[in-house]
Amino acid sequence: MRLRLLSLPFILSLCAPLLPLNTLAAERIVTIGGDVTEIAYALGAGDEIVARDSTSQQPQAAQKLPDVGYMRTLNAEGILAMKPTMLLVSELAQPSLVLTQIASSGVNVVTVPGQTTPESVAMKINAVATALHQTEKGQKLIEDYQQRLAAVNKTPLPVKVLFVMSHGGLTPMAAGQNTAADAMIRAAGGSNAMQGFSRYRPLSQEGVIASAPDLLLITTDGVKALGSSENIWKLPGMALTPAGKHKRLLVVDDMALLGFGLETPQVLAQLREKMEQMQ
């Protein structure tokens, strides 16, 4: 009987189905959305992430990666230049045509839910964990998140909170209903000082005074845009409100407040503590 020598590549090809996926080929992942990036890192995919969008500032390791731009003005060429095998992208990302172009190039485009409620974060974790084949880690992360969220007291308090959004060169805006800020204020047990409109409106002296906020909420980037925290009280009508008279101000991280990611329970606890101190 004649024996044939099998080549090493042939032997390895037979064994390939038995090897773990990550042994065969590592993914090259681009993450779009601060919440998505944060979750992907928490699930241990940091070594496979090759680029991220400008809203992805956490963890700090993400800041060292190439930035493919703002999630609502994506460019296909910039993303494809990173040679990704997978795009983990928030469903809030735009334009959708770019995502279609990327998918048609052979990239696995995974859309992550973008709902703006604290409870929706579990859905985001599940979507990312499934894409990364880390469902067990994902379940543990969901359980940890839900425990931290449940620890925040959500009993209603008689505190009216005004959230001001400020970006360099733009008129400061007040958050109305159907905004991420409104959802966070209500989730912490407060009430939105601005009523009667959805989304955002420019601040007006009459509107601010009439809303009579007890507490002013703003992000760290908002303070930078205004120059300093003291400049907040120079905004139209602000000094004449209960918040202005008592200098009641809470400054929080932008993505932690508005991104609905892993840090949501932490910023809710900050807001809740500040409101309880006012009682």
UniProtKB/Swiss-Prot annotation:
Its main location: periplasm. Residues 28-279 form the Fe/B12 periplasmic-binding domain. Part of the binding-protein-dependent transport system for hemin. The keyword Hydrolase does not apply. One of its GO terms (biological process) is iron ion transport. This is Hemin-binding periplasmic protein HmuT. Coiled coil: none annotated. Residues 1-25 form the signal peptide.
